[in-house]
Amino acid sequence: MQIFDTHTHLNVEEFAGKEQEELDLAKEMGVVAHNIVGFDKPTIERAMELTGQHPELYLTLGWHPTEAGDYSPEVEAYLLEQLKHPKVVALGEIGLDYHWMTAPKDIQEKVFRRQIQLSKELDLPFVVHTRDALEDTYAIIKSEGVGPRGGIMHSFSGSLEEAKRFMDLGMMISFSGVVTFKKATDVQEAAAGLPLDKILVETDAPYLAPVPKRGRENKTGYTRYVVDFIAGLRGLTTEEVAQATYDNARKVFGLD
C-alpha cells in the first residue's frame, strides 16, 4: 500500500531532531511520500534541507497569508530563487486567513493574487490555505483563473457543494484529519461525494490530528487514519483509496 501525505510540516520546530522517527513511523503505516510545505523563510530553508536528506520528500514553497504583511519585492525574489529547487512540486501555501487577521484583507488579497500569477508563470500548481474566507477565496481564484497545472484546496473544511464549485474551477480537494471529526458532517459528505480522481489526503502535521489521535500532536504517518476514514465513507477498501489518492497526488505534482 502506498499513501501520499500531500501537506505536512516536518520542517517546523515541533519535529526538530525527530524527523527520522516520524518518517520511520510513516513508512510502517504505509505513508511513503510526503509533501513538505514551507511558508516563510525559516520553514522554507528547513524544508529544503530535509528534502536533500530524504528522497521520499517533496517541496511546496510559498508565502502564507498570515505572513502577507511582510511580502515585498525582496521576498518575491527570494521565493522565485527557491522555487527553482528540483524537488519543488507546487507553490503554496497561499490564500486568505480571516481568523488570525495578521494582515489586512486587501494586503492578503494582493499577495494571494500575485502568487497565483507566479504559479502560472512557473507552470506549477498552487496550494490554497483558506480560513473563515471561503467566498472571497473562491472569487479570487475564479477571477485569476487556474492554470493548466491546477491547484489544491488544502485541508478542505467546506461542504460538498462548495467543494464542487472549486473543483469546477480546476482545483483538487485535499482532506485532512478534520474529515474524521464527529461534527464535520459537511466535510464528510464532500469526501464521500466527490469523484475519487479529484481528492487528495494530508495530515497538516503537527496540526489537526485525526480521530483516534485527536488532541495530540499530529504525525505524517497518521495520513493512514484519513485514508481509512474516507474508505469507510465511500464503501471502498483502504487500499483502493490509498492508491487512488497516491496516483492523484503524483499527477497533480507532475511526478508521473
Describe the role of every protein-language-model region:
Residues 1-256:
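Mid-domain alpha/beta scaffold segments of enzyme catalytic cores
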